[in-house]
Amino acid sequence: MLQTYLQSIMNQSHLTYDEVESVTNLMLNGADPHQIAAFLAVLKYRGETPTEVAGMISALQKQATPVNLPFPALDIVGTGGDLANTVNISTGSAILAAACGIPIAKHGNRSVSSQSGSADVLEALGIEIEMSPEELLSCVQEVGIGFMFAPIYHPSLKKLAPIRKGMKFPSVFNILGPLLNPANTEYALIGVSNEPILELMSEVCLKFKNTKRTFLFHGSGLDELTTLGKVVGYDIQQGKKTRLEIDPTSLGFNSCKIEDLKGGNSKLNACILKKAFMGQQSAIADALIFNAGAAMWVFGNAATLEEGIHSARKTLMEGEALRVLAQWAAFSQQLKLKRGSCN
C-alpha cells in the first residue's frame, strides 16, 4: 500500500490530508523499512506541502500521550538538521527563560544528526529526563520548567528512529518534531534550519496549529537565534503572520563567528552552558539571552524584543539560570527516587 503513495509522490503528485494520515499510519504500523526510507527521501526531494505536514501531525498526535497543563506555557525548540554542531542553545535558552518567569514545557529527543540532542545535554546537566505527564506537571509547577522526552510521549516513533538515523540527512520528521509538543503549548519559539522550510512551517502554523503566538525564525544557516548574522522570521498570532528581519547588532549584541558557537558531546556542551549561566561572557551567552528575551516578548512578559533581552541579560547575570538548573536537577531526581520507592 505504501508503494502506491510512493509512486504518487515520485510522479510529483501532492497527497491529500487524509492520504498522508494513512501513509503515516502505514509507516508506524509495520511498513517495509526500505519503502519508508524511499518515501521520506522522495518527499524531501520533491518538497513537502503544508497539507501533507499537517496530515502527518494529525496522525502522530492521535497516537501521542497528551499532557494537560492548566496554565499557558512555552517551548523553545529547533528543527535540527543544520549540521553545524553548535552547543544546545535552545535547551540552555529554555532554562534561562524559565528563570525569567516563563513556564517552559520543553519537548525533545536524543541526537539524530548532531553529537548532542536536548535529552543528552539535560542528562549531562543532572536532569532526570524520563517523566510521566503527572511528573512533568509537578516539575513545571515547582521549578518553572519540565522536559517531555519524545520516546515516552510519542512511542510510535521509536519504530522509525533507526530509519531516520540511517538516512544521514534531515527528513520531514525534522519539520514535524517542533510541532508535536505533547502539551500543545500556547506559545513557541521554533528555529528552522533553512529559509524554504521557514516558509513551509509558517503556513502550517498559520493554517493548522492552534497556538496563541509562535515565533518562527532562521538565523544565518542555523535553526537558532544567535548573533552570527541577520535573523529572518515570522511572528504568527491571531490568524496572521508578520515577516520580521532582525539585525542582532541593532539590539546591542556583538557579531560572532560560527566557531564561537561550536559544541561537542553532551558533557562538553553541559560544561559550556554552565559557564554561560555563571556569567561568563561569550557568543553562547549572547545567544541564550537573545532567545530568552524573545521568549519573554512572545509570551507577553515584555512589551518589545529589546525589553525582553534587557530582562534576560539581567536575569542571567544575577545567577538565576544557574539556580533554576540546580533546583530542576534536584527536584527531577527526587521524583525519580519517589517513583522507585513506590515500585
Curated annotation (Swiss-Prot):
Catalytic activity: N-(5-phospho-beta-D-ribosyl)anthranilate + diphosphate = 5-phospho-alpha-D-ribose 1-diphosphate + anthranilate
Binding sites annotated in the UniProt record for anthranilate 2: 164
Cofactors named for this entry: Mg(2+)
EC number of this enzyme: 2.4.2.18
Domain of life: Bacteria
Record-linked InterPro entries: Anthranilate_Pribosyl_Tfrase (IPR005940), Glycosyl_Trfase_fam3 (IPR000312), Glycosyl_Trfase_fam3_N_dom (IPR017459), Glycosyl_Trfase_fam3_N_dom_sf (IPR036320), Nuc_phospho_transferase (IPR035902)
Chain sites annotated for binding anthranilate 1: 78, 109
Pfam families, per database record: Glycos_trans_3N, Glycos_transf_3
Sequence intervals crossing the membrane: none
Binding residue positions for 5-phospho-alpha-D-ribose 1-diphosphate: 78, 81-82, 86, 88-91, 106-114, 118
Keywords on record: Amino-acid biosynthesis, Aromatic amino acid biosynthesis, Glycosyltransferase, Magnesium, Metal-binding, Transferase, Tryptophan biosynthesis
Residues that bind Mg(2+) 1: 90, 224
GO cellular component, one term: cytosol
Binding site for Mg(2+) 2: 223-224
Pathway: Amino-acid biosynthesis; L-tryptophan biosynthesis; L-tryptophan from chorismate: step 2/5
Class of this enzyme: transferase
Annotated GO MF terms: anthranilate phosphoribosyltransferase activity; magnesium ion binding
Entry's cofactor comment: Binds 2 magnesium ions per monomer.
Function statement: Catalyzes the transfer of the phosphoribosyl group of 5-phosphorylribose-1-pyrophosphate (PRPP) to anthranilate to yield N-(5'-phosphoribosyl)-anthranilate (PRA).
Assembly and binders: Homodimer.
Annotated HAMAP family: TrpD
Protein family membership: Belongs to the anthranilate phosphoribosyltransferase family.
Name of this chain's protein: Anthranilate phosphoribosyltransferase
Upper classification of the organism: Bacteria, Pseudomonadati, Chlamydiota, Chlamydiia, Chlamydiales
